[in-house]
Amino acid sequence: MRSDYCGTLRSEHIGKTVSLYGWIDGWRDHGGVIFLDLRDYTGIVQIVADPQRTPESYHLASSLRNEYVVRVEGRVSARPEHSLNPRLSTGTVEVYADTLAVLNRAETPPFAISKDEEVDEKLRLKFRYLDLRRGRMQKLLRLRHRVMQIMRRHLDERGFTEIETPVLVKSTPEGARDYLVPSRVNPGDWFALPQSPQLFKQLLMVAGFDRYYQIARCFRDEDLRADRQPEFTQLDMEMSFLSMEEIIALNEGLVAAILQETMGLELSLPLPRLTYAEAMVRYGSDKPDTRFGLELVEVSEVFRESSFQVLSGAVAAGGKVVCLPVPGAEGITNTRVKPGGDLFEFVTQFGARGLLFARVREGGQVDTIGAFSKSLTPEIAAGMIEKTGAQPGHLLLFGAGDRTAVPTVLDYMGRLRLKMGEELGLIDPNRHNLLWVTDFPMFEWNAEEKRLEALHHPFTAPRPEDEHDLKTARALAYDIIWNGVEVGGGSLRIYRRALQERVFETIGLTEEEARAKFGFLLDAFEYGTPPHGGIAYGFDRFVMLIAGEQSIREVIAFPKTQRAQDLMLGAPSAVAERQLKELNVRSTLPPKTQG
């Protein structure tokens, strides 16, 4: 029976007989005495096998290899002064092995467990059970557990009830694709895996639970990025009878508690806020990284009368001319900004038709090249400098477009801002800026489907003063942003049937479609639905930022690859024809390409 954990032994344990279990982390033979490093999740302790004291243990120790699982019983002793190891928490003691037993042997691992070295990610994911044995991964997953504990404790203390919601639900696709599950007992019908517990948590408010939370598993069949997985975890919350200000304040307290306990970071509350419009105009993003300046500046009026039609034409068409003033940019060559250059190509992949630039020289002279140069009058040059505050050494980068192209212009200029900030070393990795973005548009235009769609989801309430024209309404929505990453988002919800039906109509749902997809919700609104709102946090992403990692795969025990594959299990995989028949499903793929 285990008496102690390896990493917990200290000088005060000297003289104690202990029983330890763990893995062999290292093996050394020094002058006939064998030293073993025994590891468990708490750390490493040195084991001494001395042939003069216990010949049997010494003989067995000589046959051990790394990652063998062993049991050790022996007495804790003080290390000789010459062998003290300040790098170990147990570096003042060692255990003389009186008995030693091998519980299991191990093959040579495909990568070192005890060394914190770079390993190919595919190899790590294939042997994830070994990857998770490494100290770094142990710390990350235990951090994840700790964050979850803090969340639960904080919400429990404030009257929240944790309630689980179903995983087999109705498919109501709005946005990302659903994962579908065929029903064997109802042939031809399908369940979907939930993209969020959104509707269930609203129904729990109808049911009178007042304050709900859940650490929920969610599923989305979408293309993957560094911060996306097909299955992921949310901290999901919903509250009745609270204003937007009260919900934001409650969540600021939650986030502050988590960051203080895990990082020692003291947040200054209340957090700053930006409206969606402000964030887009100043940063070109609805999730702005405010750790550095380099803000966008609208210079439309400067170019309204310009002879350069690219810019004046955009303004005349109700559009904008946007400038990114980049200081200390002497090292950025014209070649990089011209067609074929990396900065030019960077913005074109996000919809830019080109990238104009000008430089501010000593004495305030502004120069550029090509047709833009010919239109650059002294008045326009002076206007550019006055509007942007540019100094000698500044590189001025311009994007422009008509009214319909403004969102695209702001987006690619915002991305260019981030790229320049990273390249010029303007972003302090040790700084943590959190803020709220509010007043999002209710809807955005889907050019492919030629219809409006909900920017967040169609259950978000509009600002009361905007209800008369839902197409241009602002939402009572709020996202919390951390260093340019959205870690949570929520809103006040619609709780009146008539308004919900108007929103469904605005996004192009017929009355019959709305009834088929959401009839249960509309019916619930007839039975005394309270005002309510909530928020959901991307839990994996939140832990990733706390840990200082770059991918959520680092803080998930068994993640999928960016191709949505589990390399360890070999999933997804083909299934037997018999299983498909039981489900009344037939594959249209040729047999050789299935799976």
UniProtKB/Swiss-Prot annotation:
<comment type="subunit">
    <text>Homodimer.</text>
</comment>
<comment type="function">
    <text>Aspartyl-tRNA synthetase with relaxed tRNA specificity since it is able to aspartylate not only its cognate tRNA(Asp) but also tRNA(Asn). Reaction proceeds in two steps: L-aspartate is first activated by ATP to form Asp-AMP and then transferred to the acceptor end of tRNA(Asp/Asn).</text>
</comment>
<dbReference type="InterPro" id="IPR004365">
    <property type="entry name" value="NA-bd_OB_tRNA"/>
</dbReference>
<feature type="binding site">
    <location>
        <position position="486"/>
    </location>
    <ligand>
        <name>ATP</name>
    </ligand>
</feature>
<feature type="region of interest" description="Aspartate">
    <location>
        <begin position="198"/>
        <end position="201"/>
    </location>
</feature>
<dbReference type="InterPro" id="IPR029351">
    <property type="entry name" value="GAD_dom"/>
</dbReference>
<dbReference type="InterPro" id="IPR004364">
    <property type="entry name" value="Aa-tRNA-synt_II"/>
</dbReference>
<keyword id="KW-0030">Aminoacyl-tRNA synthetase</keyword>
<dbReference type="GO" id="GO:0005524">
    <property type="term" value="F:ATP binding"/>
</dbReference>
<feature type="binding site">
    <location>
        <begin position="538"/>
        <end position="541"/>
    </location>
    <ligand>
        <name>ATP</name>
    </ligand>
</feature>
<dbReference type="InterPro" id="IPR004524">
    <property type="entry name" value="Asp-tRNA-ligase_1"/>
</dbReference>
<dbReference type="GO" id="GO:0004815">
    <property type="term" value="F:aspartate-tRNA ligase activity"/>
</dbReference>
<feature type="binding site">
    <location>
        <begin position="220"/>
        <end position="222"/>
    </location>
    <ligand>
        <name>ATP</name>
    </ligand>
</feature>
<keyword id="KW-0963">Cytoplasm</keyword>
<dbReference type="InterPro" id="IPR006195">
    <property type="entry name" value="aa-tRNA-synth_II"/>
</dbReference>
<dbReference type="InterPro" id="IPR004115">
    <property type="entry name" value="GAD-like_sf"/>
</dbReference>
<feature type="binding site">
    <location>
        <position position="456"/>
    </location>
    <ligand>
        <name>L-aspartate</name>
    </ligand>
</feature>
<feature type="binding site">
    <location>
        <position position="174"/>
    </location>
    <ligand>
        <name>L-aspartate</name>
    </ligand>
</feature>
<dbReference type="InterPro" id="IPR047089">
    <property type="entry name" value="Asp-tRNA-ligase_1_N"/>
</dbReference>
<keyword id="KW-0067">ATP-binding</keyword>
<keyword id="KW-0547">Nucleotide-binding</keyword>
<dbReference type="GO" id="GO:0003676">
    <property type="term" value="F:nucleic acid binding"/>
</dbReference>
<dbReference type="Pfam" id="PF00152">
    <property type="entry name" value="tRNA-synt_2"/>
</dbReference>
<dbReference type="GO" id="GO:0005737">
    <property type="term" value="C:cytoplasm"/>
</dbReference>
<keyword id="KW-0648">Protein biosynthesis</keyword>
<feature type="binding site">
    <location>
        <position position="229"/>
    </location>
    <ligand>
        <name>ATP</name>
    </ligand>
</feature>
<dbReference type="InterPro" id="IPR012340">
    <property type="entry name" value="NA-bd_OB-fold"/>
</dbReference>
<feature type="site" description="Important for tRNA non-discrimination">
    <location>
        <position position="30"/>
    </location>
</feature>
<dbReference type="Pfam" id="PF01336">
    <property type="entry name" value="tRNA_anti-codon"/>
</dbReference>
<dbReference type="GO" id="GO:0006422">
    <property type="term" value="P:aspartyl-tRNA aminoacylation"/>
</dbReference>
<dbReference type="InterPro" id="IPR002312">
    <property type="entry name" value="Asp/Asn-tRNA-synth_IIb"/>
</dbReference>
<feature type="binding site">
    <location>
        <position position="493"/>
    </location>
    <ligand>
        <name>L-aspartate</name>
    </ligand>
</feature>
<comment type="similarity">
    <text>Belongs to the class-II aminoacyl-tRNA synthetase family. Type 1 subfamily.</text>
</comment>
<protein>
    <recommendedName>
        <fullName>Aspartate--tRNA(Asp/Asn) ligase</fullName>
        <ecNumber>6.1.1.23</ecNumber>
    </recommendedName>
</protein>
<keyword id="KW-0436">Ligase</keyword>
<dbReference type="InterPro" id="IPR045864">
    <property type="entry name" value="aa-tRNA-synth_II/BPL/LPL"/>
</dbReference>
<feature type="binding site">
    <location>
        <position position="220"/>
    </location>
    <ligand>
        <name>L-aspartate</name>
    </ligand>
</feature>
<dbReference type="InterPro" id="IPR047090">
    <property type="entry name" value="AspRS_core"/>
</dbReference>
<dbReference type="Pfam" id="PF02938">
    <property type="entry name" value="GAD"/>
</dbReference>
<dbReference type="GO" id="GO:0050560">
    <property type="term" value="F:aspartate-tRNA(Asn) ligase activity"/>
</dbReference>
